[in-house]
Amino acid sequence: MFVPFLIMLREGLEAALIVSLIASYLKRTQRGMXDCVMWIGVLLAAALCLGLGIFINETTGEFPQKEQELFEGIVAVIAVVILTWMVFWMRKVSRNVKVQLEQAVDSALQRGNHHGWALVMMVFFAVAREGLESVFFLLAAFQQDVGIWPPLGAMLGLATAVVLGFLLYWGGIRLNLGAFFKWTSLFILFVAAGLAAGAIRAFHEAGLWNHFQEIAFDMSAVLSTHSLFGTLMEGIFGYQEAPSVSEVAVWFIYLIPALVAFALPPRAGATASRSA
């Protein structure tokens, strides 16, 4: 439940910040009449992401066992790529993003009689990107942790992000977004490492990967996945009490370079947003 909550909170907050920046700029430049056009783009993006998620989730249940394992492995790999890109993209986000959004709004509103649709599409693509990232991650997370709690966590995370987005827009709160994105990014790298190990396990069960399947270690006597804490660790980080050598290797092969890259200072001119 916690991982879907955190991911949807983060992704939802990113989308909320984009919408908030656009809405604030429209209001500041006395073009508030375009607000309804902006919300059309937001709703279209939300409908696309929701529809795609439901379609994929419903159709995969009809796959034979091996094909389903293969699909789960592919989704996990896509989720790892998306999460990693999301973490390092955010590190490169600077205050120029606000300027770029404002320039994009100006450009969209200056395209003659069709400026309304131009703004709709601009907002649509900006929000849909965040939503599509969430779709693939949630598909991987729901496969790793079944039951009602992961979807509930995702909905709570999204609802929290929406509330925070409105409060930020109205000026009711100020958040240290730099610290928020920094610590959630670090957490997400560990989640992605667990997904990477889970992808190898899924590919093995699909019959595609049969190398290094010896048990690396057995922690069942110390931290069983049948215990409360073990279940939480499995749901959050993909913990396995008796992982194979290939799962452990993939976990380290992904995580160590990712942590090193994350610890390095961002390139000059690319500083993360501090607050809003």
Curated annotation (Swiss-Prot):
Its main location: membrane. It holds the Pfam family FTR1. Residues 23-35, 91-118, 169-179, 266-276 are cytoplasmic. One of its GO terms (biological process) is iron ion transmembrane transport. It is a multi-pass membrane protein. Part of a ferrous iron transporter composed of EfeU, EfeO and EfeB. However, this EfeUOB tripartite iron transporter is defective in E.coli strain K12 due to a frameshift mutation in EfeU. This is Putative inactive ferrous iron permease EfeU. It comes from Escherichia coli (strain K12).
